């Protein structure tokens, strides 16, 4: 399977993040990408560096002021006369009212939580992660049956104008929007442990892109503010946003009950192409997991997705149990490839 990854995606190296009242050691680390690249090579996938599609297809999804913020905030942060640290991190979170005067106010608007420090190379890493998604979308748009965007940093929590949940640019949404150039109806299926509230926000009022998410109950669990089953879309998009939350502690069987529900929604929508937001953080030993999916379970998931026989862009999202990433990737792609050739 065609796989896209740029070495600069590994340049983002966060030092810490803030969650639930504590400063914590980062989980979204460069080694995640290294393990997944190794798995791709072991499976015989051609791993290619993406072309540079420029900023325009990213700006088709994200606010241009936000993109400028991501590109410049670290330089402005380091230029402050006081020592504000090596990473831009906000301790103020106010979208509105916000005059956006000064870098601290801009960070208050554009960093939605404490999990997205912006270091010297964060923008470059996020930019090339998005370019990997665009390259995979271009390959599928041009006739490849499937392509893998090995995205890191991940993306599905990134909002139109704000970073959050380890995510800066919404790779899956960028890929889905790019697919719309050829495909009238695009579905995004999200199987990450956490609800992709960024994807939901971007497509919430649209009927040409269906978003279906299987995730842990967001009550007191990231993203906490969205991902509930009564969020169905708005305006023309009413009915085209489907959330399938799982109780914490769910079994693998319960996970696949939600997968069956999601597949029914996809078949009802009858998309021309699919974007899969693939998270390995539903693995039973993942530090973020609240369900019990096994390595073999990822093979079953791949088999079910492959059985749809849709042009498919697979976009990497979470997965933080470093030791299991290669095995889980091999299992998923083995199941997917068993039907796709």
Swiss-Prot record:
<dbReference type="InterPro" id="IPR000286">
    <property type="entry name" value="His_deacetylse"/>
</dbReference>
<feature type="binding site">
    <location>
        <position position="192"/>
    </location>
    <ligand>
        <name>Zn(2+)</name>
    </ligand>
</feature>
<comment type="pathway">
    <text>Amine and polyamine metabolism.</text>
</comment>
<comment type="subunit">
    <text>Homodimer.</text>
</comment>
<feature type="site" description="Polarizes the scissile carbonyl of the substrate">
    <location>
        <position position="320"/>
    </location>
</feature>
<dbReference type="InterPro" id="IPR023801">
    <property type="entry name" value="His_deacetylse_dom"/>
</dbReference>
<dbReference type="InterPro" id="IPR023696">
    <property type="entry name" value="Ureohydrolase_dom_sf"/>
</dbReference>
<dbReference type="InterPro" id="IPR050284">
    <property type="entry name" value="HDAC_PDAC"/>
</dbReference>
<keyword id="KW-0479">Metal-binding</keyword>
<dbReference type="InterPro" id="IPR037138">
    <property type="entry name" value="His_deacetylse_dom_sf"/>
</dbReference>
<comment type="similarity">
    <text>Belongs to the histone deacetylase family.</text>
</comment>
<protein>
    <recommendedName>
        <fullName>Acetylpolyamine amidohydrolase</fullName>
        <ecNumber>3.5.1.-</ecNumber>
        <ecNumber>3.5.1.62</ecNumber>
    </recommendedName>
</protein>
<dbReference type="GO" id="GO:0040029">
    <property type="term" value="P:epigenetic regulation of gene expression"/>
</dbReference>
<keyword id="KW-0378">Hydrolase</keyword>
<feature type="binding site">
    <location>
        <position position="194"/>
    </location>
    <ligand>
        <name>Zn(2+)</name>
    </ligand>
</feature>
<dbReference type="Pfam" id="PF00850">
    <property type="entry name" value="Hist_deacetyl"/>
</dbReference>
<comment type="function">
    <text>Involved in polyamine metabolism. Catalyzes the deacetylation of various acetylated polyamines such as N-acetylputrescine and N-acetylcadaverine.</text>
</comment>
<dbReference type="GO" id="GO:0047609">
    <property type="term" value="F:acetylputrescine deacetylase activity"/>
</dbReference>
<dbReference type="GO" id="GO:0046872">
    <property type="term" value="F:metal ion binding"/>
</dbReference>
<keyword id="KW-0862">Zinc</keyword>
<feature type="binding site">
    <location>
        <position position="281"/>
    </location>
    <ligand>
        <name>Zn(2+)</name>
    </ligand>
</feature>
<feature type="active site" description="Proton donor/acceptor">
    <location>
        <position position="157"/>
    </location>
</feature>
<dbReference type="GO" id="GO:0004407">
    <property type="term" value="F:histone deacetylase activity"/>
</dbReference>
């Amino acid at each position: 399977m065609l796989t896209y990854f740029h070495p600069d995606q590994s340049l983002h190296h966060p030092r810490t993040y803030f969650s639930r009242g504590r400063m914590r050691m980062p989980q979204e680390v460069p080694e995640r990408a290294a393990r997944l690249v190794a798995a791709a090579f072991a499976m015989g996938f051609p791993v290619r560096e993406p072309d540079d599609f420029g900023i325009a297809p990213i700006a088709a999804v994200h606010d241009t002021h936000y993109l400028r913020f991501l590109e410049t905030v670290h330089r402005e942060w380091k230029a402050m006369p006081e020592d504000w640290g090596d990473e831009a991190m906000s301790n103020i979170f106010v979208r509105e009212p916000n005059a956006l005067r000064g870098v601290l106010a801009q960070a208050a608007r554009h960093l939605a939580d404490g999990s997205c420090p912006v270091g010297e190379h964060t923008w470059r890493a996020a930019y090339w992660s998005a370019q990997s998604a665009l390259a995979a979308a271009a390959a599928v748009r041009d006739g490849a049956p499937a392509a893998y965007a090995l995205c890191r940093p991940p993306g599905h929590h990134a909002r139109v104008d704000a970073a959050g949940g380890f995510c800066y640019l919404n790779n899956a949404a960028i890929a889905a929007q790019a697919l719309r150039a050829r495909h009238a109806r695009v579905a995004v299926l999200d199987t990450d442990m956490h609800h992709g509230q960024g994807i939901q926000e971007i497509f919430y009022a649209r009927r040409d892109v269906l978003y279906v998410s299987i995730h842990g109950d967001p009550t007191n669990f990231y993203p906490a503010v969205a991902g509930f089953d009564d969020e169905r879309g708005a305006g023309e998009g009413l009915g085209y946003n489907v959330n399938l939350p799982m109780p914490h502690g769910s079994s693998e069987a319960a996970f696949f009950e939600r997968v069956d529900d999601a597949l029914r929604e996809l078949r009802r929508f009858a998309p021309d192409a699919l974007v899969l937001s693939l998270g390995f953080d539903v693995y039973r030993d993942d530090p973020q997991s609240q369900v019990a999916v096994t390595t073999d379970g990822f093979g079953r998931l791949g088999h079910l997705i492959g059985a749809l026989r849709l042009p498919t862009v697979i976009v990497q999202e979470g997965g933080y149990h470093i030791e299991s990433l290669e095995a889980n990737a091999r299992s998923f792609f083995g199941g997917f490839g068993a039907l796709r050739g």
